[in-house]
Structures are given as C-alpha cells and as structure tokens.
Regions:
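Alpha-helical transmembrane segments of integral membrane proteins
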Residues: 2-3, 13, 89, 95-129, ...
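N-terminal signal-anchor/signal peptide hydrophobic helix marking the start
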Residues: 6-16
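Phosphate-coordinating loops and pocket residues in cytosolic domains that bind phosphorylated ligands
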Residues: 7, 40, 53, 82-83, ...
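Hydrophobic alpha-helical transmembrane segments of membrane transport/permease proteins
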Residues: 15-66, 159-180
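Short, hydrophobic secondary-structure boundary micro-motifs
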Residues: 19, 36-38, 63, 78-81, ...
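Membrane-water interface segments at the C-terminal ends of transmembrane alpha-helices
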Residues: 22-29, 59, 70, 134-165, ...
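Hydrophobic aliphatic residues
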Residues: 26, 30, 38, 42-43, ...
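An internal, D/E-rich "acidic patch" concept
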Residues: 58-114
C-alpha cells in the first residue's frame, strides 16, 4: 500500500510541473504588455521599460519562469494589476466560495444518482430502468446556464421562495448561506445526476455478469444482499473515478453558474480578470484550478483501493 501511494505521488509531480509551465507560457503569449497596462495610456516609453525591468519582463523566458516558480513555491503569486491586492489571498478566498458550491453539489448528486443507477441496473429493461435512463438522458441534454436561468426565474422571481442573486457564506450565516446555495447547487445537481446515473448503471451491469455474483445467488442469498453487499462495492470503483472527474471539472468550469447567479467565486474572478487583462490574477486562477484538478484526481486514486484492492496488487 505504501508503494502504491508513493507511486501515485511521484506520478503527480510531472503533471504539476507540466501544468506550471503551461500556465506560465499561456500568460506570456497573451497579447498586451503588463507594464504598459499597469502605467496607463499616458506612460512614457522610458517608464514602461523601467516597469518591465522591475517586473523581470526584460529577462529571458527560462529566467522568468524560474523566478516565478520560486515565488509561487514561497506563496508569492504577485499582486493584482487592477487593485494592487495580493493575488494568493484573493484567489484562495474566491476558491473557497466555488469549492463550497461544487462539493455540496457533487455530494448531493452522488447520494441521489448512484443508488438510482444501481437500481436501474438491478431492474434492467424494466419500466423503472427505462424511466431512470430516460431521465438521465434528459438531464444531460439540458445546458447548465439555461437550467440556472430557468430555476432563477421560477423559484426566485415568480414564486419568491429563494434569493435570486448574490452569495452569503455559511460560516457567516448558516440559514442565509444555505438559502443562497440552493439554486446554484440545484442547477449543478440536476445536470451531474445524468452522468452519474448512467455510469453507476453501466458499472453495476458489468459486475452483475461476473461469476462471483452467480455464485452468491447460487448460495441462496437474496437479490438485495447480492446487489448491495457483493456487487455494489466493486461496481462503485468506476463511479468513484467519475465523481472525481466531475468534481475537478466543476471547479474549473463553474464560471457560467457564478455569472448567472452573480456569485463571487473563482470562475467569475477569472472571467473579470481576463476582461481587465489582470495577468497575475489570471495566472493565479489558472494555476489554482489546474492544481486542484490534479490533487482531486490524486485523492481519487489514493482512495480507489478501498473499492478495488486489486489495484494495489497490480
């Protein structure tokens, strides 16, 4: 087990290095001069050149990368060009907002969709199976931004049951924070349920065809015992991987939901920074999203042996 964990950690290091180089390179190739942007339109060429020297932009790309990577390791992501705010605290505060929404949404979607997918597999080709698969297909076909607007108009504006726009932290106000979370979380849950129902159904069907399931049935075990005690654990492995992928994808792609509901999360910060050409903040957001995706998948890999111990042996 220790060897398995070490191998996964070592495999993550090249990925993190590649992500860092890619983020650094992407920002450097964006049109525009950060020094000129910081000084404004009235700046003289001499002032711009002095600012480029101060920012280290006059150095070669490899030198710039080493300086930037060294600063990042020390927790220095630079300062925002727009408001001169330190990038790391800004990105972390916005990331926590996004993470709160995404984690709650993925947890709820998993609790509903995984049992539904297992039941659909158990009742294969029945009316229940057809209804669940049809529902999953329908949920997958709905664009998230359209669904978010629909829920906002119906529950927020027409019925007036829930706050329409904005965000309140659960830590500051438990009840108010939960009310503000309902609509964005519901939007994500409805969409991701479609993916998880289909994945749980497919993996469960595959396991139910294995010999040890036939043996368990031959021993006289009830169908519910065969399903939940013997089939579910092995069937959950691929679904667990999909949950990790969904979690990572949502952390990087929640900008649409945050824009619809005006939530001050990481996705909206990235969009605003792109329009403002705030390069240090864009770079910090991209790096944070990329690293969170890598770490989420590393976490998924490390827990996978709980569902399939054969992974460690292999």
């Amino acid at each position: 087990m220790v060897r398995f964990i070490l191998s996964r950690l070592l495999m993550a290091l090249p990925t993190i290095a590649f992500v860092s180089i890619t983020v650094f390179a992407l920002i450097r190739f964006i049109p525009g001069d950060p020094a000129a942007l910081m000084l404004g339109d009235m700046a003289q060429p001499e002032q711009i050149e002095a600012m480029r020297t101060e920012l280290g932009l006059d150095k070669s790309m490899p030198q710039q990368f080493l300086i930037w990577a060294g600063n990042v390791v020390q927790g220095d992501f630079g300062r925002s060009i727009v408001n001169d705010e330190a990038v790391l605290p800004l990105v972390v505060s916005r990331f926590l907002v996004s993470a709160e929404i995404v984690v709650v949404a993925v947890l709820l979607a998993s609790l509903i969709a995984v049992p539904a997918g297992v039941i659909a597999a158990w009742k294969q080709n029945s009316l229940t199976d057809l209804a669940l698969v049809g529902t999953a297909t329908l949920l997958l076909s709905i664009p998230t931004f359209w669904l978010g607007l629909l829920l906002l108009l119906f529950f927020g504006l027409k019925l007036g049951w829930l706050p329409v726009l904005g965000y309140v932290s659960i830590g500051d106000n438990l009840v108010g924070g939960m009310l503000y979370l309902v609509l964005p979380v519901m939007t994500l849950v409805i969409h991701e349920m479609g993916v998880l129902i289909r994945m749980a159904r497919a993996s469960t069907l595959e396991v139910l065809r294995l010999d040890y399931i036939t043996h368990a049935r031959a021993k006289g075990l009830s169908e519910s015992a065969v399903l939940w005690r013997h089939a579910f654990k092995n069937a959950f492995g691929p679904t667990w991987t999909m949950i990790g992928l969904i979690l990572g994808n949502l952390l990087g792609g929640i900008a649409v939901i945050e824009t619809v509901f005006t939530i001050p999360g990481l996705g909206r910060l990235m969009v605003d920074s792109i329009f403002a050409r705030d390069y240090p903040v864009i770079q910090g957001c991209l790096l944070f999203v990329s690293l969170s995706y890598v770490l989420v998948n590393l976490f998924v890999d490390l827990l996978y042996p709980l569902f399939d111990p054969r992974v460690v042996a292999e």
